Amino acid sequence: MSDTAPLTIAVLLGSVRVDRQGIKAARLLVSALEKRGHEAVLVDPMEIRLPLLDRMYKEYPKGGAPAELEQLASLYRRADGFLLVSAEYNHGVPPALKNLLDHFLEEYFWRPSAIACYSAGGFGGVRAAMQLRMILGELGMPSIPSLFSIPRIGEALADDGQPKDERTTKQMERFLDEFEWYAHALRRQRASGTPY
């Protein structure tokens, strides 16, 4: 596989709230990745409707997991990276995102993650992002150094998800440049073998 071959990126949205704003950011990022020639698959907990975690995917007998988990496992195994779109609820990670993440483990290994975070206020979700970094490292998909933080998301993105200002666009492009670099680098390294 060439160094510049298109990547497969799973874009995990972390909100199921009514009138959620994160869907605009998720669609923006999916579109931006596709414009770069990559396959970007939106994983939306509003559509998937996973149950609250009582058994991880790996704890089901082979072929016995619910269809939704089998589909996600298949996507995650072929993914080159994970881009998380997270709100900040009470200074923390949204429960829908944590539930979505916790159903899997080995499927994430040796792949980078990137965090796009947002809020209605001025902090842009960064407090949730700091918690996510610890979680993602433990799940085996360390996050890249940069964040794509969107403060005042209702003002920053139009209804169709397009940025209303140049700063947001520039920040997103730089963030995606960095994420691509890590995804290509770790894909090369996975191809040559993993520690276990």
Name each model-derived stretch:
Residues 112-153, 166-170:
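Short, glycine-/small-residue-rich phosphate/pyrophosphate-handling segment
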Residues 48-49, 56, 65, 104, ...:
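Glycine-rich, flexible loop/turn motifs
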Residues 80-82, 111-114:
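Short, surface-exposed connector motifs at secondary-structure boundaries
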Residues 1-99, 106, 162-196:
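N-terminal beta1-alpha1-beta2 submodule of the flavodoxin-like/Rossmannoid cofactor-binding fold
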Residues 5-11, 112, 151-160:
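A short small-residue
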Residues 99-107, 134-138:
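A glycine- and small-aliphatic-rich helix-loop capping segment at beta-alpha/alpha-beta transitions
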